């Protein structure tokens, strides 16, 4: 089992502005293992960006303890390292942002080389390092181009190469794909996954989009008003969300909310017969492989009219959603619901026939 490379224990961050006290982060505990791609998701004002500054050691917490790669860096708001040791710890963390922050008058390779200006490498070693980094992010042929000659995705690749220049163990992505189109976003996420595998890089994804979490992360924390309200594996959170905000994020990411809007306009749903109901079925793992709807028809004479279906692969495990109209005798539908529950399917009744 991988050990935690980032440990935030009971972190409070409070700001004082004149007569106001702002509790930006309240009693947050997060442990991120080596090699994780860990998502922190929430709307604006949730405390995500403040938490980023704690993780990359730019913000001292008011209370709580921070341990990075085995070293306690802050405890009860007090720094535990020398200034030099803290600077070195900060170099162990790379950052990429929504805005690429490239220097317009420098080429791609010069932008990457700028991150090595304090390195002990020789000039030749730095040149080789820059070439290797641009190859790693798939941009070696654009080494001599200026930012104005690059697309948004290419600029972000330069920013990633620059963030990796000092061989960090941790990479923080703070809304790094928010300014990109969907196709380019997928390409950048695929690159980050590749870097995670190749380098053993621990990646922290700060985002307001659960779709990003679904596509790339293995664990996720959901924040609201400075509080961590839910945390777990992506599989557990998507298949069994507990909090209303988490459920809202997930229905948006999976397209269920949009599907329901359209389904509710269909005549079959507007005029459900008395012996029918509209239900959402959620299932994960082996239950996705079972012909359950055929089974409940054979056993209970309950028909299932599928109005929507979707299967995602999360952390190598299939997770599915279906919206169906179940029709049959009332006692048979109850028996079918029980059988579905026993097979590991979560059944939510959305509407009953009149």
Curated annotation (Swiss-Prot):
Enzymatic reactions: L-methionine(out) + ATP + H2O = L-methionine(in) + ADP + phosphate + H(+); D-methionine(out) + ATP + H2O = D-methionine(in) + ADP + phosphate + H(+)
Transport keyword on record: yes
Binding site for ATP: 42-49
Domain ABC transporter per the UniProt entry, residue ranges: 8-250
Entry membrane topology: Peripheral membrane protein
The organism of origin for this protein: Streptococcus pyogenes serotype M18 (strain MGAS8232)
Family: Belongs to the ABC transporter superfamily. Methionine importer (TC 3.A.1.24) family.
Enzyme Commission number, as recorded: 7.4.2.11
Any Pfam family matching the protein: ABC_tran
Name by which UniProt lists this protein: Methionine import ATP-binding protein MetN
Keyword match Lipid metabolism: no
Subcellular localization, as worded in the UniProt entry: Cell membrane
Signal peptide: none
Cellular component aspect of the GO annotation: plasma membrane
Task performed by this protein: Part of the ABC transporter complex MetNIQ involved in methionine import. Responsible for energy coupling to the transport system.
Keywords (A to Z) from UniProt: Amino-acid transport, ATP-binding, Cell membrane, Membrane, Nucleotide-binding, Translocase, Transport
Gene field: metN
Uppermost EC category: translocase
């Amino acid at each position: 089992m991988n050990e935690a490379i980032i440990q935030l224990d009971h972190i409070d961050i409070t700001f004082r502005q004149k007569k106001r006290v702002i509790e930006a982060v309240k009693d947050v505990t997060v442990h991120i293992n080596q090699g994780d791609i860990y998502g922190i998701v929430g709307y604006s004002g949730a405390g995500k960006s403040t938490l980023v500054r704690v993780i990359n050691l730019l913000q001292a917490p008011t209370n709580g303890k921070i341990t990075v790669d085995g070293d306690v860096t802050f405890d009860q708001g007090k720094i535990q390292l020398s200034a030099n040791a803290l600077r070195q710890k900060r170099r162990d963390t790379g950052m990429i942002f929504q805005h690429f922050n490239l220097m317009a008058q420098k080429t791609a390779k010069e932008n990457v080389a700028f991150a090595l200006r304090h390195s002990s490498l020789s000039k030749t070693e730095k040149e080789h390092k820059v070439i290797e980094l641009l190859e790693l992010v798939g941009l070696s042929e654009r080494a001599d181009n200026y930012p104005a000659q690059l697309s948004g995705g290419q600029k972000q690749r330069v920013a990633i190469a620059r963030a990796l220049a000092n061989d960090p163990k941790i990479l923080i992505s703070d809304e790094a794909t928010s300014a990109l189109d969907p196709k380019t976003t997928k390409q950048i996420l695929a690159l980050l996954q590749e870097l995670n595998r190749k380098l053993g890089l621990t990646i922290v994804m700060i985002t307001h989009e659960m779709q990003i979490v679904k596509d790339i992360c293995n664990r996720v924390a959901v924040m609201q008003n400075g509080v961590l309200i839910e945390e777990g594996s992506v599989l557990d959170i998507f298949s069994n969300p507990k909090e209303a905000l988490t459920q809202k994020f997930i229905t948006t990411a999976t397209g269920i909310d949009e599907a329901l809007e359209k389904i509710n306009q269909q005549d079959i749903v507007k005029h459900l017969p008395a012996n029918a109901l509209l239900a959402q079925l959620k299932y994960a793992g082996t239950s996705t492989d079972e012909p359950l709807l055929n089974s409940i028809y054979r056993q209970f004479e309950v028909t299932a009219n599928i109005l929507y279906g979707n299967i995602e692969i999360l952390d190598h495990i299939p997770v599915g959603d279906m919206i169906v109209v179940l029709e049959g005798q009332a006692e048979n539908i109850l028996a079918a619901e029980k059988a579905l529950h026993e097979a590991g399917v979560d059944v939510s009744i959305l509407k009953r026939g009149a």
